[in-house]
Amino acid sequence: MKVVLFCGGYGMRMRDGGEDIPKPMAMVGDRPLLWHVMRYYAHFGHKEFILAMGYGATQIAKYFRDYDETHSNDFVIDAGTVRPLTTDIADWKITFVHTGIETPIGERLRRVAPHLGSDEFFMANYADVLTDAPLDDIVDEFVKSDALASLLAVPPQSAFHVVDVDSEHRVSGIHSVATMKIRENGGYFVMRRELLDHLEPGKDLVGDTLTKLSAAGKVLAYPYDGFWMPADTVKERVVLDELAKADRSPWALWSTPCNTDPVGVSAPVPAEVAEVVDGVDAVEDSEAGAPRTATGEVIPLLSGR
């Protein structure tokens, strides 16, 4: 099944104050976030990728053009010829499509549609979130349904509380977001080709197309309480990077057993994740009074860290 990866959004500035890079190219261990997402799909046998590119397209394309299999695989040099003993992407097919800078996700999907061929089913992903969700089960459940799209539904990630306010502005209830019976869109989609007929020019995928289809009962959710983590904040990126460097990556199903301990509303965070989060929290606490940019990012100080 082909996999469309939406990797055309604007870049982000790293903690070290370096230049902006496309979010999918943020390093997680010794490989970009995008590589980890693709490796997850390849683990389940899905190795045809369509990259819907925009901002940072040159960096993304260059990374794969210059890909070095010996960077993370054992190899032999024989009479001057380098021969990797194992490979990561040698059997992948990657199509690179420029879809614009300011383009909404739905429009990006419209622009790569010709590359999907006549396949009845395909998958899509925001290319900036990692999980250990059972992809085979997600696909099987969707294929057996009459839905046009399926999305991974994860517990709320916010640590905030919500309040019930009456007409006199009195608070009648306070609730933790994490305990509410709601789910967030986890960014892992399975779709039928028919969905493409519902895409309108210049519209968003979730906010427009899937919202309308859900009202008609044509969108399926796969609730999942296991490991799921985006890379939207500095804290999240640091946690993912540290887990990868320590070889404790729950999402790396190709090299580690599936982490079956649920994460979310009803279960504690796995120890390896909690340990890293605690360390990052300590750093963030120490930066509480540090100078920040207009967008809230900490301006690094010469602190020796």
Residue ranges and their predicted role:
Residues 1-62, 66, 96, 270-277, ...:
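N-terminal glycine-rich phosphate-binding loop and ensuing alpha1 helix
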Residues 120-123, 130-143, 155-158, 170-269, ...:
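Catalytic-core segments of class I nucleotidyltransferases/pyrophosphorylases
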Residues 33-36, 108-111, 209:
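Well-ordered alpha-helical segments embedded in enzymatic catalytic cores
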Residues 59-167:
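Conserved beta-loop-beta/alpha segment of the NTase-like Rossmann-fold superfamily
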Residues 25, 162-165, 221:
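A structural signal for short hydrophobic beta-strand segments in well-ordered beta-sheet cores
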Residues 3-5, 51, 124, 149-152, ...:
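Structural beta-sheet core signal
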